[in-house]
UniProtKB/Swiss-Prot annotation:
Pfam families: CARD_2 (PF16739). A lipid is attached at residue 79 (S-palmitoyl cysteine). Changing residue 148 to A: Complete loss of cleavage by Seneca Valley virus protease 3C. The keyword Lipoprotein applies. The pLxIS motif constitutes an IRF3-binding motif: following phosphorylation by TBK1, the phosphorylated pLxIS motif of MAVS recruits IRF3. IRF3 is then phosphorylated and activated by TBK1 to induce type-I interferons and other cytokines. This is Mitochondrial antiviral-signaling protein. The modification Asymmetric dimethylarginine is found at residue 236. Its main location: mitochondrion. CDD domains: CARD_IPS1 (cd08811). The gene is MAVS. Changing residue 79 to S: Loss of palmitoylation. Changing residue 429 to A: Decreased cleavage by CASP3. Abolished cleavage by CASP3. Residues 145-165, 179-216, 317-331, 339-355, 373-382 have a biased composition (Polar residues). It comes from Homo sapiens (Human).
Length: 540
């Protein structure tokens, strides 16, 4: 729900008493935003609950429809409720955005740098600032024309000077414009993305002889400077490794005209060529390459490392090469401790462990410690291996005897504890005479009693008859007339009478229901007869 409609709905709820005179049945035809189902339901609610209660349902249903405020205002005017319509319209307009009345501003193109001259020339050129860093330019693409070329660089530079500014610019003796590095940096802002797009388009038509075929669109630039970034337009089919100095010859042929800018352009061309061709650097073991000749993408060091590259015979004295994209360590291989895994790169080559000072990478160091003595591997960590005890040999090497001895020695203490004399004693019992179905857990008072092997049924009594078990002691009055020793002071029975009175079973039989009714009837008759006899005696 928009903000204005939400505020209008809350205003109507707060001032609901002002809308009580709105007839729901009358206003429904003026609300086309409501569906037929909504209108039928509201009419039924108005018939059952009345008009006032139905107004709540009407506003609740309206606020779910888009644009309901305009429909409601028009419906109020149709029902001749102009005051309410104006009130709702004023509230609705007060919450409308302020800028919605005026048309939106036309879209303006993004602002351009202040140094940009008038309309661009037919072709866009490339230029590099003095610090070899490309500046930003507008994000929209620049028009590029590949086929049309100006007559001469002198005329193009003169036209660009006239369009840019009337100030005087020094010229070379041969007529070409000469600019400083600050002017070039201000007049040639180009992004790397723009260079990549235009390099791919201009690379197909550019040749080594066309050194000044394009003119800059942002000011006069010398032909040599404008040509420097186009060093990447050479064919990229040759991927063979070569020296780092083998850059495009056209990129360095114009270094005599402008030394500072040409060197920056040549460096940029070298970086582009190295990133595209990914040429590896090959250094001999005796000489070191200069630091500025290494590309930025090769994390190698200048120290000669006695390692062997992939698919190269393992001869550290004759060949010591470093792959261009494999990071190598600056420390010699002899400093690698024996307890660390070796580099997995030269894993499939036979390496002389005595010369290289390291074990082959196929054998883990943990296996070397167990199968090879420390004297055969002349590494720096050999003294460490001599101090530490050797790991136990595997069971396969000794026929499994060492593993069995270790396990037996570990369990020797536990076995001696379990077999102490006098703690655990075995007892031979008589064989069981019953069946397995009679087995059960029976309660025993003490552990020293002998086992009972009788059937379990003997421990229970039959429940064929009902009996009353008397377990209370006889009173002292019953024992006064009986001969014998006196009773106990606690009131207990005498020893002779213990069997008679301690437990006595009195059998009782359940009477039938007919006998009970007969006894009750006989008793009633006797009572009535007795009452009649007594009544007659009183009368006489």
């Amino acid at each position: 729900m928009p903000f204005a409609e939400d505020k209008t709905y809350k205003y109507i709820c707060r001032n609901f008493s002002n809308f009580c005179n709105v007839d729901v049945v009358e206003i429904l035809p003026y609300l086309p935003c409501l569906t037929a189902r909504d209108q039928d339901r509201l009419r039924a609610t108005c018939t059952l609950s009345g008009n006032r209660d139905t107004l709540w349902h009407l506003f609740n249903t309206l606020q779910r429809r888009p644009g309901w405020v305009e429909y409601f205002i028009a419906a109020l005017r149709g029902c001749e409720l102009v005051d309410l319509a104006d009130e709702v319209a004023s509230v609705y307009q007060s919450y409308q955005p302020r800028t919605s009345d005026r048309p939106p501003d036309p879209l303006e193109p993004p602002s351009l740098p202040a140094e940009r001259p008038g309309p661009p020339t037919p072709a866009a050129a490339h230029s590099i600032p003095y610090n070899s860093c490309r500046e930003k330019e507008p994000s929209y693409p620049m028009p590029v024309q590949e086929t049309q070329a100006p007559e001469s660089p002198g005329e193009n530079s003169e036209q660009a000077l006239q369009t840019l500014s009337p100030r005087a610019i020094p010229r070379n003796p041969d007529g070409g414009p000469l600019e400083s590095s600050s002017d070039l940096a201000a007049l040639s802002p180009l992004t790397s993305s723009g260079h990549q797009e235009q390099d791919t388009e201009l690379g197909s038509t550019h040749t080594a002889g066309a050194t000044s075929s394009l003119t800059p669109s942002r000011g006069p630039v010398s032909p040599s400077v404008s040509f420097q970034p186009l060093a990447r337009s050479t064919p990229r089919a040759s991927r063979l490794p070569g020296p780092t100095g083998s850059v495009v010859s056209t990129g360095t042929s114009f270094s005599s005209s402008s030394p500072g800018l040409a060197s920056a352009g040549a460096a940029e061309g070298k970086q582009g060529a190295e990133s595209d061709q990914a040429e590896p650097i090959i250094c001999s073991s005796g000489a070191e390459a200069p630091a500025n000749s290494l590309p930025s993408k090769v994390p190698t060091t200048l120290m000669p490392v006695n390692t062997v590259a992939l698919k190269v015979p393992a001869n550290p004295a004759s060949v010591s090469t470093v792959p261009s994209k494999l990071p190598t360590s600056s420390k010699p291989p002899g400093a690698v401790p024996s307890n660390a895994l070796t580099n997995p790169a030269p894993s499939k080559l036979p390496i002389n462990s005595t010369r290289a000072g390291m074990v082959p990478s196929k054998v883990p160091t943990s296996m070397v410690l167990t199968k090879v003595s420390a004297s055969t591997v002349p590494t720096d960590g050999s003294s460490r291996n001599e101090e530490t005890p050797a790991a136990p040999t595997p069971a396969g090497a000794t026929g499994g005897s060492s593993a069995w001895l270790d396990s037996s020695s570990e369990n020797r203490g536990l076995g001696s504890e379990l077999s102490k004399p006098g703690v655990l004693a075995s007892q031979v019992d008589s064989p069981f005479s019953g069946c397995f179905e009679d087995l059960a857990i029976s309660a025993s008072t003490s552990l020293g009693m002998g086992p009972c092997h009788g059937p379990e049924e003997n421990e229970y009594k039959s429940e064929g008859t009902f009996g009353i078990h008397v377990a209370e002691n006889p009173s002292i009055q019953l024992l006064e007339g009986n001969p014998g020793p006196p009773a106990d002071p606690d009131g207990g029975p005498r020893p002779q009478a213990d069997r008679k009175f301690q437990e006595r079973e009195v059998p009782c039989h359940r009477p039938s229901p007919g006998a009970l009714w007969l006894q009750v009837a006989v008793t009633g008759v006797l009572v009535v007869t007795l009452l009649v006899v007594l009544y007659r005696r009183r009368l006489h």
